[in-house]
């Protein structure tokens, strides 16, 4: 018999009957996951996560690119049928999620990228500008994994379409 001391603490994962190799799994590191909402943990789901009770609303867009973002929400357009322009996007919007009205053009979106705005929510966007933003033509696809500084959520569709009154008022 030979006694060996493991250089690490852990749990024996497996022992090979052929080679005698012992695989030891180190203690798992806890993973912290942001909830993106404030609230109260009402249930713990073993090995999966938690349920958070919160006063919240769910706004679903028609289309989005850039994944999840967080920041203070600021209404920038004066109405739900106003276009979000370059002039509307200020340095003070850096790190924020801004809400426009009916549309954001490619130049205004580039301004938001340049200023590191975290997200833009508008009624519409030009489909043909997506290729310039992404660097490739987007077909039918699951979106949200694009590596973009500024996420874009389009609530109504392609083109200049005023944001629904209900959505705009909720965000306002």
Model region roles, listed by residue range:
Residues 1-172:
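Well-ordered secondary-structure scaffolds
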């Amino acid at each position: 018999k030979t006694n060996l001391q493991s250089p690490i603490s852990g749990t024996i994962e497996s022992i090979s009957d052929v080679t005698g190799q012992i695989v030891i799994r180190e203690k798992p590191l806890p993973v912290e996951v942001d909830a993106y909402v404030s609230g109260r943990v009402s249930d713990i789901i073993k090995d999966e996560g938690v349920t958070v009770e919160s006063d919240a609303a769910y706004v679903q867009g028609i289309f989005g690119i850039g994944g999840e973002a967080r920041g203070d929400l600021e209404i920038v357009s004066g109405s739900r049928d106003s276009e979000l322009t370059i002039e509307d996007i200020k340095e003070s919007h850096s790190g924020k999620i801004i809400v426009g009205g009916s549309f954001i053009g490619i130049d205004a979106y580039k301004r938001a990228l340049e200023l590191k705005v975290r997200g833009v929510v508008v009624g519409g966007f030009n489909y043909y500008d997506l290729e310039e933003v992404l660097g490739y033509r987007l077909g039918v696809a699951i979106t949200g994994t694009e590596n973009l500084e500024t996420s874009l959520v389009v609530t109504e569709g392609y083109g200049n379409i005023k944001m629904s009154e209900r959505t705009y008022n909720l965000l306002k």
